[in-house]
């Protein structure tokens, strides 16, 4: 009897162990979960794009200012990959508000020619694949949002006007503002793969199922090129994972956009190695699952920034300042200044210690005076753009942070990041100029009063 129970206990133990082992193996191997690109967009996307914030507390607010009476310009000059422009305006149903938006239903209608005061529906501008949205849930302001695709075949320009010039406080007038949007034609090649039955007239020379060999297709991309996959059901890590047969890898912060039936991959400006890949699976049905592998080109671009390490083997930095050469309790300043009307740059820091703050997502605003500490803010809000790509790397004992900007920035900006190693601190002070918008704003200051006199 004891022998039987002893064997029974052994048998039960073996059974439970085997059952647990099978569950672990099954869960680790598991099947891919497939979702629509739109579902994945809801799970992964925040706000990507640009803001013109004319609300009372906004960066472009038009409240009366005795010191600063100039008109305000909010300019956007960029290509778009389903990025958004968010126009934030005071509630217009407030009887005390003198704020006017022209045209009233901007962005549904816009000015195509500010000099001719030509008001047209947005569909007549030539935009391809865009969406409009309004959000009135906030009690203090409303939001007008336009989301723009990369498929325009020409540069497109349009305007809206925000007017708060009536006398709102005694004899002091409020201010006016120009919203100036230039949607650039996407500057790089767009490669498309259509695995749906739908025709998209703006996807030219698209690959299809016949181009796959054994359900697999690999496509090489040059820097900045887009790959647009049209598919109804994609795996839930689409383009976020590597081709497992290769050692290279890409970064989680690459530009990957999910929109309607599209999964879009932008070849990054910074690639870690020459065998980096990313893949996406498209499920037609249980028997037909296609794997698309993208392989970005590898190019060693110069990094505008500061290498505080003695190691010069990782890429080329414009400034090299080895912290180990300095005495303790020393602060080292590394200054980097760039001024271009159009950017295609990598900006970065290499640090053998700790990078402070969480650069480049977070950065220090420049010091306003010696008695006040720098404030921490977000890089996209400091530059007032949303089209930024962030990269991280480790090389030996050095932590490397990099970001890239492509296009123009609305206004010049400065910020600081720190590299702290024991009792030595390196300060990277970055200044990014905006030559184009400095010239444009001067024209606007002269022109906008004439415009309102003419209205």
Curated annotation (Swiss-Prot):
A lipid is attached at residue 433 (GPI-anchor amidated glycine). It is a lipid-anchor; GPI-anchor. Residues 434-455 form a propeptide. It is found in: Cell surface; Cell membrane. The keyword Iron-sulfur does not apply. Heterodimer; heterodimerizes with PF230. Gametocyte surface protein required for male fertility. This is Gametocyte surface protein P45/48. It comes from Plasmodium berghei (strain Anka).
